[in-house]
């Protein structure tokens, strides 16, 4: 007589406790974004059983850069690493802070001798996780070193220590981001873009096991122009004259991505867009 007891379902990426879950939140914009992240990030870590959280703090200080105080507050609410981009130097006091805080990253393809760190490896209960911050060049005012050879060398070096590698590629052009995804497929666990503040619907795991998304979006005010107040932006488009952009206000959208990784190989098993709403 056969055993009629149904077989236990195979573990899925969302249920297997042995897999590593990395949460990444896109560009945090100003005080509204910071407040939203301070509330939502701890909730997401609990809800999604996150092992390692990364946030982009590029625009967290009034839309331009990040301060030491803000960096510390983001770490206290659950960010293991903070990535940045072209606005990293906007707040002058951050330079001395970065020298002693390796968890706050700036793009790795700045010239040799630039203050701060472009990458870091941290220990977790499920193995070491490496994070690299990279900046693109297409349509970007800052022309840093070519990101393609720079990241290749950085990844090769980091893989000596861990196969679990996450890359925040801060870039404007989607084509440059997509090309970088193919450039790194099979060599890193995930590459997720930032900078445009608009989440893309192209998340996927590439053929060789790298999770990819062109842009994670932003953590900032919904009723805005990619985080900025609407009226000054409209004025600039109408008059073609300079206008000061403040950060928008009101309800906040939290955008990001959840990547599930096999810690033994570093291969991504899934990537999922994350969206939450918060209002003060």
Language-model regions: role of each:
Residues 2-280:
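Acidic, metal/ion-coordinating pockets
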